[in-house]
């Protein structure tokens, strides 16, 4: 007889709270407030949900740039230290193919024509596909944030409705299942996520406590960003690298959120659902279609030409958390360039982690080399798609 957990049959709205509690289906605690018929119906629903999730295609999307490509220098793409290639993508791909092999396709979005350590596109298309920045944005860009505001366009390139988004320095540290990223609510596959905002603080507080996260620090970070916005003529969009900013950014996105009407200029999204979505929950509208007219790439910063875009920068894609069933071990380092020995002590116990080894002057060439050696230790086996 299949054993269901209390998480499967109790609260369909917030299943995270009880996910670790294994309780047999006959347990009186579960059936205390529901009839046997109702409980059997819930078990049938859970079985159906598991089948729905099993059949749901899930893709991985990487944003990548290799600034060693001479073509990009000719095209004038900004040369930024944090975008220097340390072959992180090679190990990120190995981590995905090893630890979440159930993904359907891996899409690499980039301004480059090819990835220098991978075989030609036609030889790897069974699993890995390339998308050019210019095909999504209308122009090539070194900016991940520009691309992230255009996630809704990925459906046009064959990306699954539900997908896992990663920069090229994100890694899957241990084997994970679909159910670690997504679950089914009312027959619809949705990602685990958590919304953080002062408007939603009271509802989020119990979840923060459960996950051992400091919401005050997060709110201070958010307030500081907004304060900076108010004092500058142009809004500065904070690119999230590592888990320093990843606390208030997204690694997992649901395409459906962004598939309807574009927001009118100046609109502010004051409410995001922070966990389950019911069928009657109206879809959130897609964020701005960012093109040259609204944004320009200048040095290491993406600047908005209009104050109208200010609130949008901090109210949309960058207000989610990533959660999975091992949430207490997700790596959220205060600094990505801390002592390398301390860094790897944390990373080796993480299910998801990020190594941004080129984003700051504090990160020396020696540390970059150490990081690469450690990645080679963690993910030593080449994939069949590598040259």
Question: Where do the model's predicted regions map?
Answer:
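ER/Golgi luminal nucleotide-sugar-dependent glycosyltransferases, focusing on the catalytic module
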Residues: 1-164, 170-387
């Amino acid at each position: 007889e299949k054993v269901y957990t209390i998480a499967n049959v109790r609260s369909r709205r917030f299943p995270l709270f009880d996910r670790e509690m294994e309780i047999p289906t006959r347990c009186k605690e579960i059936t205390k407030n529901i009839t046997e018929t109702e409980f059997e119906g819930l078990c049938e629903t859970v079985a159906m949900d598991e089948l729905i999730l099993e059949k749901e295609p899930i893709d991985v999307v990487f944003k990548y740039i290799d600034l060693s490509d001479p073509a990009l220098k000719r095209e004038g793409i900004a040369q930024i230290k944090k975008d220097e290639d340390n072959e992180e993508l090679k190990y990120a791909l190995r981590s995905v193919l090893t630890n979440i092999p159930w993904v359907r396709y891996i899409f690499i979005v980039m301004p480059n024509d090819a990835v220098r350590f991978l075989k030609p596109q036609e030889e790897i298309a069974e699993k890995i596909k390339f998308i050019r920045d210019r095909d999504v944005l209308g122009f090539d860009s070194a900016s991940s944030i520009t691309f992230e505001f255009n996630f809704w366009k990925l459906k046009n390139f064959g990306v699954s409705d539900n997908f896992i988004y990663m920069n090229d320095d994100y890694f899957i540290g241990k084997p994970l299942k679909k159910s670690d990223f997504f679950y089914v609510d009312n027959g619809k596959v949705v990602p685990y996520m958590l919304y953080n905002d002062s408007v939603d603080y009271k509802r989020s507080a119990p979840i923060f406590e459960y996950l051992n996260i400091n919401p005050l620090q997060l709110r201070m970070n958010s307030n500081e960003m907004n304060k900076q916005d108010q004092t500058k003529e142009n809004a500065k969009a904070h690119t999230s690298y590592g888990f320093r900013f990843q606390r208030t950014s997204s690694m997992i996105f649901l395409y459906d959120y962004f598939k309807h009407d574009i927001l009118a200029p100046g609109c502010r999204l004051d409410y995001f659902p922070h966990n389950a979505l019911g069928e009657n929950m109206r879809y959130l509208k897609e964020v701005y279609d960012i093109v040259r007219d609204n944004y320009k790439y200048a040095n290491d910063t993406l600047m908005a030409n209009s104050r109208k875009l200010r609130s949008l920068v901090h109210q949309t894609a960058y207000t989610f958390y990533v959660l999975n069933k091992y949430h207490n071990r997700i790596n959220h380092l205060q600094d990505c360039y801390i002592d390398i020995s301390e860094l790897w002590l944390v990373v080796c116990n993480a299910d998801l982690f990020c190594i941004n080894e080129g984003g700051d002057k504090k990160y020396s060439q020696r540390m970059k080399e150490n990081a690469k050696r450690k990645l080679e230790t963690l993910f030593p086996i080449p994939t069949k798609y590598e040259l």
